């Protein structure tokens, strides 16, 4: 019989236990959503493109699927980061296209435009909007809970999902459609100003509409119509901008690229 070293056995057990405990701590500290960002095979790309398609043409259908997700995964939020990852990729390509179009050709300038579009416009603003939506809904819009009812609340990640869903149609309108209409939108005419401002009011109104649908899909929230109120403000600003002859496309391009068109 071979001699057994209990010291080695114990150290081996400690190593295995330590590795297991480290892995469990890692899983607790980093949610599955963020871990899967680095595991492309775990992302459901086909389902993500299905969501993107219907967000543009029938967004209410997307949120009907949300209730099924709650029943199967016991959470409202997506556990798959594919949507955010693909949207970031699309935004990087679009912002790089704008940089090339306006002769922002140096490497640092291209990175600057991509960084601003992805990490400021989409991620930073999105984190802020999601946090505000999460706080407002949980603080003011939840239905009163009865004694024997389960207390439910809006998940922060679901609020961020809503932002991602709402941002995609806005991206299509204000990044993609606007890009192909630039020869018209940048002309010095009243028609160009009206067309440009119409694109912006459609894009942002659609953003708030999809946001409303997202929160309205939660059965424990009430008065979610408040998420449609900003559309009225947008319409008033639209009228003012048209009367003043303000072209929002020109203003945005001047802001991003630092020159006067």
UniProtKB/Swiss-Prot annotation:
Mark the transmembrane ranges: 37-57, 82-102, 113-133, 166-186, 190-210, 225-245
Q: Which domain of life is it from?
A: Eukaryota
For membrane topology, the record states: Multi-pass membrane protein
**Cellular location of this protein?**
Membrane
Task: One GO cellular component term, please give it.
Answer: Golgi membrane
Q: List the disulfide bonds.
A: none
Mostly located where? membrane
Q: Which UniProt keywords apply?
A: Membrane, Transmembrane, Transmembrane helix
Regarding protein family, the annotation reads: Belongs to the unc-50 family.
Please give the name of this protein.
Protein unc-50 homolog
Taxonomic classification, please?
Answer: Eukaryota, Amoebozoa, Evosea, Eumycetozoa, Dictyostelia
């Amino acid at each position: 019989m071979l001699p057994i070293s209990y010291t080695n056995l114990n150290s081996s057990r400690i190593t295995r236990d330590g590795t297991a405990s480290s892995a469990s701590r890692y899983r607790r500290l980093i949610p599955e959503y963020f871990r899967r960002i680095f595991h492309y095979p775990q992302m459901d790309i086909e389902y993500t493109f299905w969501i993107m398609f219907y967000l543009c043409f029938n967004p209410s259908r997307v949120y009907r699927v949300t209730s099924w997700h709650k029943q199967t995964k016991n959470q409202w939020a997506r556990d798959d980061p594919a949507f955010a990852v693909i949207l970031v990729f699309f935004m990087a390509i679009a912002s790089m296209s704008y940089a090339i179009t306006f002769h922002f050709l140096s490497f640092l300038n291209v990175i600057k435009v991509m960084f601003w579009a992805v990490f400021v416009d989409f991620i930073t603003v999105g984190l802020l909007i999601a946090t505000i939506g999460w706080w407002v809904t949980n603080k003011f819009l939840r239905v009163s809970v009865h004694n024997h009812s389960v207390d439910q609340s809006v998940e922060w990640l679901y609020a961020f999902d809503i932002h991602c869903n709402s941002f995609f149609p806005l991206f299509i309108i204000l990044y993609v459609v606007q890009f192909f209409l630039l020869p018209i939108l940048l002309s010095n005419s009243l028609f160009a100003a009206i067309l440009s401002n119409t694109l912006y009011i459609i894009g942002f109104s659609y953003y708030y509409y999809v946001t409303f649908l997202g929160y309205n899909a939660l059965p424990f929230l009430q008065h979610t119509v408040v998420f449609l109120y900003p559309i009225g403000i947008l319409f008033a600003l639209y009228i003012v901008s048209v009367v003043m002859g303000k072209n929002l496309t020109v203003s945005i391009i001047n802001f991003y690229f630092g020159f006067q068109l």
